[in-house]
Structure formats: structure tokens, C-alpha cells
Amino acid sequence: PAAYRYTEAKMAKMSAEMLSDIKKNTVDFVPNYDDKHQEPDVLPSRFPNLLVNGSTGIAVGMATNIPPHNLREVIDGIIATIEDPEITIEELMNYIKGPDFPTGGIIMGRSGIRQAYTTGRGRIYVRAKAEIEEEENRIVVTELPYQVNKARLAKYINELVRDGKIDGITSTRDESDTNMRLIINLKRDANAHVVLNNLYKFTQMQETFGIIMLALVDKQPKILNLREMIDYYIAHQEDVIVRRTKFDLKENEDHAHLLEGYRIAIDNIDEVIELIRSSKTIPEAKEALMARFTLSEVQATAIVQMQLGRLSGMERDKIEADYQETMEKIKSLREILADEKLVLKIVREDL
């Protein structure tokens, strides 16, 4: 694990979904880099973050470069996989069309996407989105390939013009506000289509994005195709839901156990109060209650710690309603744990 300065991140609103139910024992915790704290080994991640936001990184002898994807498309692909476990990668591509870069751009062709989704490795060509405005005699760029810096691109275009490597351009101007808008002004006699093709050829207005879908599987690096990435995500969510359900089941069983003790106390309220009052110490009162009513230590402790006024004022109807509701929850949670189809249904509903 890395030191904090390497792992700090500003979290957006969507990040809360990555941490959802983390306090319900849904994932394992491990010591942090200096063994002073515990940190999650992996996040519950209610949405498929690795595919949606992508990942880039290098290590000794390996690298990963997973492009970002459209959230809705990825979720549709996951749901389709849950509904049809035999779905092929080609069929998945009807849902997940390809990478969805935040800066836009146009992916040229689908062969690179298909290769990446099938083998885990591929290369795609991304072009800037540009329009030729003939009346104004200029090219307007509204989208750039992923990770291309607009200011550096404009500077480089001007350098190419100055060095005579690209002809037909008089100047560049940045008119961006909330939207990207880079203006490339042309000479009167320039052929805009030729200039644009030269810009694609000689500048970052056309870039190659090498896809390497490498991820850690059981702490081991592995190249994954699209179907494998989705399968591992579904399996992770199944594990998270099973662990969350077990946590909720334990909490409800503990609550039901307490309510059973309260029911006994209410049915024998006068004797219970007398036993508590006649006991010299709290441990003595607990022992007396456990011996007389076959209560557990947890039940006896809860009764003894309750103020006598509150104990005598407990309403049997409310306790009974709470108990019946809790038992229904327990039944439902046990049904989930006994049926994988119900678990997968919850995976789908959570998405």
C-alpha cells in the first residue's frame, strides 16, 4: 500500500456509491502502509468504476490503460449479462458501443474497439471534432482527443505554421467558455479540407489510444476482455450483497433476541421488577432473571439496564409489532442467502 500523498483524491458525489455499505462488513480491511490504521482491501463500488472511469498506470514490467466508458451503457451491458449468462462479446457491444472520453472526439472505426474488447488489448484512433465554416473561412474545433491539452495544441499548430510545415493558416484563437471552441483562421486561398487533413496528420488532433485492460484479479495482474471484466464485477457485487445480507441478518437476529427477552419481561412485569428491586447489585439482578426466566445474559443485561419506569411502561403491542416485523426481515434475508437468483436480482436493482 502506498503512502497517503500518493493516494489522496478529491471525491465527487458519485464516489459515495463506491463506499456504499462499507460499514456492513461488505469488504475486507487490511493494515495501511505504516500499520497504524486499517483500510479497505477493495471498495464495495455499487457502480462499475473501473470501466466507467477507466484507469492508467505503470508498474515493473506491466501497464494498464483502460479507457472511460458511458455509465448507462456499461450498466445496460451488465444487466444484459445477468439476464443472459451466455451473451457474447459481440452481443455486448450492442450495449457498450466503445470508450466514452470526457473530452469527446471521434473514434475512427470499430476494429480497434472490437480487438480490445475481445483480447484485452487494442489500439483506437481518436480524432478531434472539427467543422469547416466556409463563410468565415475557418476551422472550428469543438472536441479534442482524450488527454490532449488545448493550449499546447494551439501553440504547436502556430509553430508548424511558422516553420512552414503546414500552410494555409493565419492564426489560432481560443474562444472556449463552458464549451470547448478553438478557432483556426485560414488564408483566403487555402483549401480547408487539405488544411484539416494536415492538422490530423501532423498534430494531436488525431491521437492513438492504446487499450490495455489489465486489472488485479485476486491480487494478481491479468489481462481481461470485456466479458471477463463484467463477470468479475458481477461476482464482486454478489459477494458484497451476500456479506451485507449476513450483516443485516445478524443485526436483526440480535434485535429479535432482545425483543424476545422484552416479551418475557412484559408478561411477568411485576415479578421482574420485584426481582430487580430485591437484588443488591446489577450482576445479582441479572443472575436472578436468567435463572428465573431462562434469559440469556444479553437479554438480562438489556432488561436490568432499562429504567424501571420505562420497563413498566413498555407496551406489549408495540414490542409484538416490532418483533413480527423483525422476523419478516429475517425470513426475507435468509431467503436471499439461500437463492443466488435473488442475489443477482438485487445486483440488478442496485444498479
Language-model features, listed with the residues they occupy:
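C-terminal interaction appendages of subunits in large macromolecular complexes
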Residues: 2-9, 13-17, 22-25, 55-56, ...
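P-loop NTPase nucleotide-binding/switch module
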Residues: 18-46
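Long insertion/accessory domains within large nucleic-acid-processing enzymes
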Residues: 36-52, 57-60, 65
